[in-house]
Amino acid sequence: MTAQKITQHPTARHPLAGKSMSGAEMIIQVLADEGVDTIFGYSGGAILPTYDAIFRYHAAHDGRQIRLIVPANEQGAGFMAAGYARSSGKVGVFLVTSGPGATNSVTPIRDCMADSIPVVLICGQVPRHAIGTDAFQEAPVFNIMSACAKHVFLVHNPEELEATVRTAFDMARSARPGPVVVDVPKDVQNWTGVFKGEGLLHFRGYEARMQALKAARVPEEKCAAFFDQLGKSERPLIYAGGGVINSDASGELRSFAGTFRIPVVTTLLGIGAMDTTHEMSLHMLGMHGMAYANYAVEDCDFLIAVGSRFDDRVAGKVHEFAPRARFVAHIDIDAAEIGKVKNVTWSFVGDARTGLGDLLAAGRKSFKKDFSQWVAYVQQLKKKHARNYDRESRLIQPQYVIECLNEITRGEAIVTSGVGQHQMWAAQYFDFKHPRTWLTSGSMGTMGFGLPAAIGAQVACPDRLVIDVDGDGSLRMNLGELETVTTYNLPVKVLLLNNLGDGMVRQWQKMYFNNRFSGTDKSLHSKDFVKAAEADGFLFAARLTENEKVQEVLREFVEFKGPAFLEIMIDQDACVYPMVGPGMGYKDMVTGDFIRSRDSETCRPGDEVDMTKVPDLF
């Protein structure tokens, strides 16, 4: 998109309109106007004018401070901004310098794009006259980030700086949320101009599309068509994704499911959209979803997808996904997702909250059908194929740890995770009663996400219990952020489930590569995580190796006033089940030795699979 002009919107005149400011001061003033209360960032030469503007803003505004959280590195800043955005629903902001500062930010930007998280990255750039000369700490941010972000701005014209920053926020949170990058040359930050206090960049056709999406409603005839299909079904199932949470549609989802008595499965990122303790909740579906959730997908005859995209971790073999569904409905804010993977019989492009609300209103007037037989059947699935693990082992089972912790938190904590087995155990065994309480890297699967995301969530929600459930591999990736926790005295609880290796990859090697553990065994690594936590200022830093003390120590850990670190040495051979292998459908789901399967003819751990003959989905 190319900006055509700056659009002024008729509002009350800004009290600072007409005042002379530097470009850096304009950036900070727009952030203040957008309600930003926290910036996560790492300084450097090309962004120094803006950091100086933060200092001067604080000096001039005793009652209106913008908190600055300085991480160990820029990737940490990006994931902190993501954790802030995911837990609060507001736009997260991070501020970095040029060159390596910007390139260190690529992974969190891509992570936010993949999971539809609204963040704004402002990065410094070398002066305009030096761009393209391989100047010190120059990197082609526009070219690099364009493939990863929702939009990237390189500010050539300083007169457009104010409107550009304001537009970045508007874009980040509009329609399908995502990350927006603003690359600001140092001389533009030092430029002096007149602050206008209003205005957005204008893009041909963009405003019209956004207005159409905001105004979109489900027409009466489409409501009738939906309920006609629902009336012809006997086994409807709602498949809810992260879009439900992004659109704040959890209330509508719960009302819809409760009113019409339709069970709900959620994606990894949709967890919390439906209270997992609700009778209509079947929790998570997919590769490591609940067995009963996946069986319900196999058995349903009407699949209602809301804010979800049929990705490979859910749909697997697309033609075998929901094979008995005669009808498939899809509600999504992004028209590109409709029919992209799975053909549908009914669709609505628009906000999930609006779509569900319109259907709910229409259905309450005229639709009546009893799905009690299906609901009873689903409840039996939950009982017969309940989650389970080796409860007799003398080794500490990670599932037991999460179960014990869940008895303490009771679905009320904000839980973040790294990526790997611990991520799946946390998703499976925690209860989540509210949206925005389960924060994890879904599509990108970025190791190192959990700790900085927990920091961002704790900053956004200072009165909430925030727990990072991490693995030894993931925690290593951003271990430096332990110091950030104590520097700002954030009461984040870091729970490390240590199995001395990259457990999820090791599980794949066990199941599909005949126990050839190449590069995943970390038992010879000498990292003492407890000493590292103590060195970074944690007053509660402990290691647990005894099964009998799990409940007692977990309670001490959670109730400690301040940052706390607990390492638990778990069974190295514990695996995540269920598991739908690569290139397989739900009928091939492996449930392990402790979860009851309704088909014992599936492949078992130890059966080597020729990985050259199945799609590479790892």
Q: Model-predicted segments: where are they?
A:
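Glycine-rich, acidic loop regions that bind phosphate or pyrophosphate groups
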Residues: 4-6, 123-165, 186, 270-377, ...
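Conformationally flexible catalytic loops at phosphate/diphosphate-handling active centers
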Residues: 171-232, 386-387, 589-591
